[in-house]
Amino acid sequence: MSDLFAKLMDQIEMPLDMRRSSAFSSADIIEVKVHSVSRLWEFHFAFAAVLPIATYRELHDRLIRTFEAADIKVTFDIQAAQVDYSDDLLQAYYQEAFEHAPCNSASFKSSFSKLKVTYEDDKLIIAAPRFVNNDHFRNNHLPNLVKQFEAFGFGTLTIDMVSDQEMTEHLTKDFVSSRQALVKKAVQDNLEAQKSLEAMMPPVEEATPAPKFDYKERAAKRQAGFEKATITPMIEIETEENRIVFEGMVFDVERKTTRTGRHIINFKMTDYTSSFALQKWAKDDEELRKFDMIAKGAWLRVQGNIETNPFTKSLTMNVQQVKEIVHHDRKDLMPEGQKRVELHAHTNMSTMDALPTVESLIDTAAKWGHKAVAITDHANVQSFPHGYHRARKAGIKAIFGLEANIVEDKVPISYDPVDMDLHEATYVVFDVETTGLSAMNNDLIQIAASKMFKGNIVEQFDEFIDPGHPLSAFTTELTGITDKHLQGAKPLVTVLKAFQDFCKDSILVAHNASFDVGFMNANYERHNLPKITQPVIDTLEFARNLYPEYKRHGLGPLTKRFQVSLDHHHMANYDAEATGRLLFIFLRDAREKHGIKNLLQLNTDLVAEDSYKKARIKHATIYVQNQVGLKNMFKLVSLSNIKYFEGVPRIPRTVLDAHREGLLLGTACSDGEVFDAVLTKGIDAAVDLAKYYDFIEIMPPAIYQPLVVRELIKDQAGIEQVIRDLIEVGKRAKKPVLATGNVHYLEPEEEIYREIIVRSLGQGAMINRTIGRGEGAQPAPLPKAHFRTTNEMLDEFAFLGKDLAYQVVVQNTQDFADRIEEVEVVKGDLYTPYIDKAEETVAELTYQKAFEIYGNPLPDIIDLRIEKELTSILGNGFAVIYLASQMLVNRSNERGYLVGSRGSVGSSFVATMIGITEVNPMPPHYVCPSCQHSEFITDGSVGSGYDLPNKPCPKCGTPYQKDGQDIPFETFLGFDGDKVPDIDLNFSGDDQPSAHLDVRDIFGDEYAFRAGTVGTVAEKTAYGFVKGYERDYGKFYRDAEVDRLAAGAAGVKRTTGQHPGGIVVIPNYMDVYDFTPVQYPADDVTASWQTTHFNFHDIDENVLKLDILGHDDPTMIRKLQDLSGIDPITIPADDPGVMALFSGTEILGVTPEQIGTPTGMLGIPEFGTNFVRGMVNETHPTTFAELLQLSGLSHGTDVWLGNAQDLIKEGIATLKTVIGCRDDIMVYLMHAGLEPKMAFTIMERVRKGLWLKISEEERNGYIDAMRENNVPDWYIESCGKIKYMFPKAHAAAYVLMALRVAYFKVHHPIMYYCAYFSIRAKAFELKTMSGGLDAVKARMEDITIKRKNNEATNVENDLFTTLEIVNEMLERGFKFGKLDLYKSDAIEFQIKGDTLIPPFIALEGLGENVAKQIVKARQEGEFLSKMELRKRGGASSTLVEKMDEMGILGNMPEDNQLSLFDDFF
């Protein structure tokens, strides 16, 4: 018994007879872990054998009681040298396990504790009845039971459960007997109770009124019971149980109303042991309001019965009682002015690595009273804009930084080179084997070397070294060296001196020499021996530069490639000899290929300019000190992503040096070079490196814990020593030492979310590399990386002493924060590019077009509108935005394409006049194209100018033109006209790339960038990660817990991208780094466009963003124009035939039954979906204005369903009068008599879904104003239901395009179908489409049946849409031809009379490139055989076979070799 253990036994007053027993003879305390914050002590004991059960219980009880008196919690485990597997001892400990958490859960204990155990075939066997859920046991309880037996001293047991038939029968018989007895007893008790009740009852005649039952008293008692009830951890519930009480946080709520008017609240709660689904019913609205506390984020106590939900098949609590409880968040307990500053924190913008939003990080720091907090995401600054805004709001300083990947520009092949002929040199090629990767914490166990001259080994050195302790299994497995190899080995210092003598006058050579040389120098330094000064060649870097085409340059792959023997890789003597053989191959190739003859040439002539791509990455934290530093930071991020990206963004050291002004550098985490030097090279080397930085980072010991598992550091004491060494490095280098937390999530319980995210990366990620080998190998655990308070951080560093801990945790971090100046990350103004005379040009173009249409002088209504808009546009610097858009549209028009507008730009009459949009926002009006006479209808009686009746000009008799959609300008630039315009344009998909290049041409390559986006983990993706984690790590979560974990893991950055049409334009008097860094989308360095590093929304109020989107409508219009020669601009918007499509099918010459729909909407943009077709069937629109209403209703949220649809059905309103588009609200209210400002404000509140979110006082003010002006109540109620509304200008642009397409469907049908299939159809099945009506209808019926059963694939759903159009075309008398090898186009459908000939790409599996190749090949000559079609046409065997089956190839032979018989004919 050790002295320390004996002292402990004295303190707990362990009985002497037990202390003197053989079990305690060699007892010792291996380690005691003290957690000062939680007041938890963990004892780790060593005993000669597993303790008798009575002794164990005595030790356990006395330890607990003794330390409880000091308010200290105790846990302990035992390592036993010998294990007794006798049945009695195992049975006793098995039952003891159920007295310890988490095995002591009620359900587990009651179901399993009485089972019998035995030890057979090296397994602990549990005999159980067959109705026990074996899978549930394995997933939920087996891991806990294994851990508990390990803590008892049995080591890692294999535990299995088997079904016992005898026990099953016995328990079944007992259950039946018990149930019968209970029923019998219940009946008897009931009879006796009835008799007693009758005996107690007074005579009837003397009966008095029964006392009233006191429901209030009963409710009070029930409530009191609820308040005092025992809280059950959710993890313990495994079966249906009654009157269970949970406490936890609500993370999901859904409220539903049944058809009977009852309400159900489905919600999910977690107590962080697990999660649970719950239900609460409310009979009416009044009762529902009592449960408003059931809200996301609320902490509740609930009581109810656990039952299996019949729909979800999972356990659900039916809640009976619920109350809100106070949850005590962690607090920073240090006084004001004595709180730390966190300087190393990651947000969810650290790709697949961290969880908190920058807002939550800053809010937490502010809540704790910290004066500042730093943001240091991995290699990016995408959280800066949000962090900037949030910090200003929270009143806290944000320190903007990042954790960078620093690399050396050129990694040398040779260290300390001298002028020496490589051919005449003597080389000592050496290798070392060690017990780990840390020169400071691990030991040398072998040094071996081959002295070589001109390719021959002239002398060898091979010595083992005894480290003074047994080798770990990992070391033996890796190196092949066992303890037997080390028996009788020489002392380390003797071997070191001998090796130094062996190396004299030679060039040292090693593979990955930085490791071997570093290890040797650290050991030389430790024994006061001179360090290596002679030249060194690193064959790893030699190979990388000499053979850059090879993917792998490790010793194993290189020896295989060059056929060099390597029989025992990782034993130093074999590795050294193999490396020597490779060296002389490299020297020969370097001489022959590159003329390398001298040692000095290796670094100057052979090291590649891009050797940084293979250089080892070192982490460093970089912080913005001032505004100059911010711009330099943006430049560094850009260069690392654009010029130096290789796997990850890299910053070469010289690039960092060139941009270091205004920046401060920290040494970062264990992946930083200073920390690495302390581990692998020694303090002296670390001091030299530390001088480059502005401060030294140290982190809580828990952050470094994975290094212990990876055997880089021995134990907790080793971690603490490394931290002391880092402090010593700072002292010697005269650099402050700062304690940082390496934050990756905020709360300790969020650790599991990061675990799930990180493990989803798979074993290819460095962080997931396994420890050891084999099936059971697991990655190192992730560190405890939550956001720590000041007091928690001081506890972590308590081992340094109070004063030093305070200095590194508080004082130094505050001092650093004080060095940081306030910077402007996001600018406060809009900076538009400069185009010479933009203002004059916009005004000139506007008036020029207005005079052309409306005459000069202009009508007052036109003149005033132009003046109003130009005042806003020119006065706020928006002219350049208008002019740039006009230039882009004009260029596309010149290439023969129409450009459609999106959004609210059609609300601007200036935009209409200069050609940005076709939508005219003026009130409905007539205008004469000859004399410019005009008439305006301003009373709101007409919804659209296109609906005005045709009539001639009263002045000259020319037919009037009709226009005007009555849209206020305010809906585009705001009521005051100062909102930054967002001009979205729909270019043809074919012309979109050219339009993008136009932006570069207009503004310059260095000023035009694609708008960047950030892609995060979606909740569905996170769900998959959780299920994968369950599978890979043997977990089992109930459904609610999976949902919680998925929600927690969602939102983390996964990738970057680009807006499909957004282009950001930087003003040409500034540069992009004034606003944002730049990068390639999704790290694709081959991309033709660079993107903004920031999400474009973060800077959209600072720079011009042009939305140049690709759309099918302009492409289809161009196709129809090419086919027909009709200018789409001349197509009338009020064509009667087109309008007839919305009321029936007669205009198409078919019946509804033939085409399966009552109207002609199939294939018409905006109106062809099932949803909108249903709306058309219900509303029967007859005017353009009503079509606008339909467009608005179909695109809005809660505008049609449950709102306008009901109003129309009930006859309260009509399609014309319901609220359809956002702009209609303002126009309608102004016509009703409301002031424009109030009408505008009401519109804004409604369209954004804010009507019910604004204060009751504000809302009532609007309601009163509307009622005073006779706005009906149904209209007001409709406003309250709306969540989102579509802009009328957007609807007008879309409807106008749709009507043009519909015009061709009515009047030029074969051209319409040709264009539709060429451009809009997504899926084809040529065999069906060419098979006639019966084949088409049969296939549609087949897909319909699949849809009903939810079995249809996405391709089949797309195919159904195509077949609807094919069916309609065939029913109208047109034909669908077969693919023709010599007539079909590569990608376009062809018209041959009344028949459509499909293109090659319509054949499933045949892509555009092959289609074009076939067309090109047939132009060169006829295909004589299938083999020739494959060879010249590039078609695969499968495609050729498919063509043959469809009869496309006719009698084409397999090959064009003449048979013997052909000569006779």
From Swiss-Prot:
What Gene Ontology terms describe what this protein does at the molecular function level? 3'-5' exonuclease activity; DNA binding; DNA-directed DNA polymerase activity
Database matches in SMART domains: EXOIII (SM00479), POLIIIAc (SM00481)
- Judged by the first EC level, this protein's enzyme class is transferase
User: Which CDD domains does the UniProt entry name for this protein?
Assistant: DEDDh, PHP_PolIIIA_POLC, polC_OBF
Recorded GO CC terms: cytoplasm
Q: Which EC number(s) does UniProt give? A: 2.7.7.7
Which Gene3D superfamilies does the entry mention?
A: 1.10.150.870, 3.30.1900.20, 6.10.140.1510, Metal-dependent hydrolases, Nucleic acid-binding proteins, PolC, middle finger domain, Ribonuclease H-like superfamily/Ribonuclease H
Task: Tell me where it resides.
Answer: Cytoplasm
Supply the alphabetized keyword list.
Answer: Cytoplasm, DNA replication, DNA-directed DNA polymerase, Exonuclease, Hydrolase, Nuclease, Nucleotidyltransferase, Transferase
Reply yes or no: does the keyword Transferase apply.
yes
Q: Which family does it belong to?
A: Belongs to the DNA polymerase type-C family. PolC subfamily.
What protein is this chain from?
DNA polymerase III PolC-type
Recorded source organism is Streptococcus pyogenes serotype M18 (strain MGAS8232)
- Which gene is this protein's source? polC
